[in-house]
Structure formats: structure tokens, C-alpha cells
Amino acid sequence: MKPFVLVLFALLALLQYRLWFGENSLTEYFTLKDRISHQQSGNAELLERNEVLKEEIQDLKSGTEALEERARNELGLIEQGETFFRVVGNDSRSIRSSEQSQDNQ
């Protein structure tokens, strides 16, 4: 009976070793599960981006409004009868120099 128990104990130890440290172990399982989760979230982001691009392509193919908007933003399109205003941001040096000139007067 004692040799039988020793064989069962050795078999149990071997199976436990393979479960925790061997090929296809639990650590590999959890690592793969984590990688799959990250990959699925990345895929979801890319699918969303693809949908936005598909909608933009469809809009550019079917309508002139999107094409005109893109030409205005990227190429500076101005139609006849429109007035173009360029808003220049405040430069801190020009503000200080104008304040100093007002102080001198």
C-alpha cells in the first residue's frame, strides 16, 4: 500500500508541476488572456477609426459640402463675394511694447 501512495504522490507532484510551470501552464494562459484583451481593445479602436474614415470617404464621394469644407480649411478656398479675415494671435512682446508706449505718453 505504501508504494502505491508514493506513486500517486509522485504523479500528483508531476501533474502540479506541469500545471504551474510546464507547457500551456496557467501562467501562460493568464498571459495570453491579457494579451488577447489588449489586442481586442486595440482592434475596437481601429474599427472605430475605420468607420470614421469610411464615412468621410462616402461624404467626399457623394456631397460637395465636405469637399468644399476641406478645400477651405486646407487650401484656403474663398468664393466670390466673400471676405477673408485673418485673426492674428496676440504676441506678448507687442502687448508689452504698446503698454510701454502708452506709459511714456
From Swiss-Prot:
Periplasmic compartment segments: 22-105
GO BP annotation list: FtsZ-dependent cytokinesis
Coiled-coil regions listed in the entry: 38-75
Transmembrane segments: 4-21
Record carries keyword Cytoplasm: no
Primary location: membrane
Subcellular location per the Swiss-Prot or TrEMBL entry: Cell inner membrane
Membrane topology: Single-pass type II membrane protein
Family matches, as InterPro entries: Cell_div_FtsB, FtsL/DivIC
GO cellular component: cell division site; cell septum; plasma membrane
Keywords carried by this UniProt record: Cell cycle, Cell division, Cell inner membrane, Cell membrane, Coiled coil, Membrane, Transmembrane, Transmembrane helix
Intervals, Cytoplasmic compartment: 1-3
UniProt family annotation: Belongs to the FtsB family.
Assembly: Part of a complex composed of FtsB, FtsL and FtsQ.
Stated role: Essential cell division protein. May link together the upstream cell division proteins, which are predominantly cytoplasmic, with the downstream cell division proteins, which are predominantly periplasmic.
NCBIfam families given in the database record: PRK00888.1
Name by which UniProt lists this protein: Cell division protein FtsB
Organism this protein belongs to: Shewanella amazonensis (strain ATCC BAA-1098 / SB2B)
The organism's taxonomic lineage, starting at the top: Bacteria, Pseudomonadati, Pseudomonadota, Gammaproteobacteria, Alteromonadales
